[in-house]
Amino acid sequence: MLNTYYNPVRTYQGVGSLSVLTQLVSSLKPGRILLLIWDESVLKNRYIKETAAAFADILTVKTFAWSNPEMFQLYEIYNETKNENYELVIAVGGGSVLDVGKSLCCLYAKPVDSLEAMRNMIAAKTYSKPHCKWIGVPTTAGTGSEVTCWATVWDSEHNKKYSVDTQDNYAYAAVIDPVLASSMPVKLAVSSALDAVCHAAESYWAKAGNTVSRAAALSAIKIIMDNIDGLLCGKEEAHDAMAQGSMLAGLAFSNTRTTACHSISYPLTMKYHIPHGVAVSMLLAPVMRLNQPYIKNRKELFNAFGVESVSELSEKVTAILEKSGSPAKLSQWGAKESDFEELVAHSMTKGRADNNPAELTAVNVEEILRSVF
């Protein structure tokens, strides 16, 4: 069987890795730069401040302080910046900021004059190759967005989730310095870490998996699970481990996409506002139970998680969520059994559900939802 793997992102990971940022930007010789940030606190970082100062005459700072970016929010920042002819976007923030940054690179290439036109273009995937390069600087450890070529955009008004997705939109570079994530609240840090674990696990069993992605996935799971207790206790070294694990998980699923956990989680986040990492991790054990007959070398997967069975994994994830202060059952988030039909109908995301090794049906999706109700 042919195995192929491709990811062109230059990665710089570890404490102090931000020291390369100014040099990276300089090597690209950009005419205009957009520095997109989550909030202004990141500008206090020595190396980000140094970069902003070095290119002050060609650099504009914009703040995007929204989680799970909505279509109208993306349009607003696009409309504010579309005439600046940026040649480089530096996105500093969590997955939402990185997703908006990489989306803008594509949107700048094919101008639109209304929110509806942008929605239609993204839905039909008729956007062009990116107009500019981007550099990803994550301030959370979980999404892996800095090493993937797609971005998630939500459209709650129409109860939909879209992707801005093209192989040409990998970052020029990813700079993953755990110092930026060290001030994350524990609940957010754990949710992000569990999102990365799900990226890795789903990559491991995905139909599109390959030798390299599976190796990266196992490493990511082990690193994160070995250090998540330290994260719960606030240990500094745990943040470095989470940054490394998240990057490896991103490198794994950048080639495979995700599967049923993500597919079923989207309506849970949209309807009940369950944080993404919490929603996917709640589904991890029941989806693994469904997939078990199709997972090759599942003992390796159990070993990476530090468990011997799906039941033990379920208990472990539930305990982690509860220790972090996140409810682990749908009913605790306001879900009702009468919602199941609607949830099932919106759980079959193309490219996710059909990438799952076990076929997803209305019956088994409802069973999965009931198991975490």
What are these regions, as identified by a protein language model?
Residues 256-308:
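C-terminal catalytic subdomain
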Residues 9, 15-16, 38-39, 92-94, ...:
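Fold-independent oxyanion-binding glycine-rich loops
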Residues 72-79, 83-176:
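Glycine/threonine-rich beta-strand-loop-alpha-helix active-site module
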Residues 302, 306-373:
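C-terminal charged capping/lid subdomain of soluble metabolic enzymes
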Residues 1-88, 330:
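ATP/NTP phosphate-donor binding region
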Residues 14, 35-36, 70, 95, ...:
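Buried hydrophobic positions in well-ordered alpha/beta secondary-structure cores of metabolic enzymes
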Residues 197-201, 242-250, 264, 284, ...:
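Short alpha-helical scaffolding segments that buttress acidic/His motifs in well-ordered protein cores
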Residues 150-256, 357:
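Carboxylate- and glycine-rich phosphate/diphosphate-binding segment that chelates Mg2+/Mn2+
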